[in-house]
Amino acid sequence: MKTKDTKAKLFGTDGVRGRAGEVITPSSVIALGTSAGIHFRQHSLTNKILVGKDTRRSGYMIENALVSALTSVGYDVIQIGPMPTPAVAFLTEDMRCDAGIMISASHNPYDDNGIKFFNHYGYKLAQEEEESIESYYYNPTSLQSALKSGLEIGSSKRIDDVVGRYIVHIKNSFPKNLTLRGLRIVCDCANGAAYRVAPIVLSELGADVIAINDEPNGYNINKQCGAMHPEGLAQEVMTYRADVGFALDGDADRLVVVDNKGNIVNGDKLIGALALYQKQIGKLENNAIVATLMSNLALEEFLKSHQIGLHRCNVGDKYVWDKMREHKLNFGGESSGHIIFSDYAKTGDGLVSALQVLALLIQSGKSSQDALNPFEIYPSELVNLKVSQKKPLEKINGLQEKLDSISASGNRYLVRYSGTENKLRILVEGKDYKLVSEQVKMLVDLCQKQLNV
């Protein structure tokens, strides 16, 4: 988080994030919390804000700074301790709060941290709302003038029993005519926010649960475990001869699955299998789903073969959700493991996704290896080309003709500049790896000549 005089953009694709104690400091968090409080009070309904966090040690520092800021502008703060990001989204609406705040850097190492905001309805903030908060952040006069005194100063209280509400909510997403009895599941909690909740949900539904990485110490979140490092989970699945393994990330909004043979399930295969299952049980709204620009062409063709439409969007679960709302859809996801079932959650929820996978396995009668391997992923090649200038793509001579030739061959391409680096990302995918490789080289050679690489 930059200092006030730089006027840099605070919000990234998923809230505000940075190294704790260097970028995310007590003073910057107080300024951000005060700014958010001013913004939310403009349309206040209940004068309450919910604050949750993951298991990072720096969460204490940030939480206290937020409480100080929010109470200083008159808000009453409810602190719920370590809880998954989707739990904060759910509980914000369920407990009728004006807003919810999650302190987490998701899958990042322990020394990073971040802050995510949810509105009264449990949705992530729109860009206009983020810009409103930023406008206050960079205006010290508005921050000072918003401070309350006397009886107008807010209060704070810690509530530890809200975990039960979330557990009931999650269990209600699982079909009531099914049980997990007879299933052995290894659950990697990433030493993160779901270390208590995940094993309880699975065991209460009848599963034999082996929980791993469920002992957070403030420094071991995501450390060689969880969704970013599922190799350890794969070994445990084989050791315990489990039916399936689930790996969550630090704030439990992401899910990676390991099948009964120890294979890490490709994210696009998981999306495809779940989409088809939702259609088969009559729950896929408008017979279409959302995936990102990075999802493999094989997923698109698999869905098409089952008469399921696909709408693509930019990378980021916020964009997945926006596209779902635009087309009135109830299922979408990213190959990285952020999957949204909007019938049950308004953001990616690793536990909801895990329960839908389990329902699929039970009703199919197949092993996880067979049920979650619905098609083969096509070969792809991605090149990140460093450039000295970001010349408009339409002004690169001959590029469109090359792209048209790739489309004519039946392959898919993605050519776009990075939003944060001086890089041009070139992706091609198709059935024949040799042709894919040749087409990538063709694009790289052309762009290198015209972008002063």
Curated annotation (Swiss-Prot):
Q: Summarize the PTM comment.
A: Activated by phosphorylation.
- Asked if the keyword Phosphoprotein belongs to this entry, the reply reads yes
Q: What is this protein called?
A: Phosphoglucosamine mutase
Give the UniProt record's GO annotations in the biological process aspect: carbohydrate metabolic process; peptidoglycan biosynthetic process; UDP-N-acetylglucosamine biosynthetic process
Q: Which InterPro entries match?
A: A-D-PHexomutase_a/b/a-I, A-D-PHexomutase_a/b/a-I/II/III, A-D-PHexomutase_a/b/a-II, A-D-PHexomutase_a/b/a-III, A-D-PHexomutase_C, A-D-PHexomutase_C_sf, A-D-PHexomutase_CS, Alpha-D-phosphohexomutase_SF
Give one GO molecular function term.
Answer: phosphomannomutase activity
| Annotated GO CC locations | cytosol
Q: Where does Mg(2+) bind?
A: S106, D249, D251, D253
Q: Which keywords appear in this protein's UniProt record, sorted alphabetically?
A: Isomerase, Magnesium, Metal-binding, Phosphoprotein
Protein function = Catalyzes the conversion of glucosamine-6-phosphate to glucosamine-1-phosphate.
From what organism does this protein derive?
Helicobacter hepaticus (strain ATCC 51449 / 3B1)
Enzyme Commission code? 5.4.2.10
Q: Which residues carry this modification: Phosphoserine?
A: S106
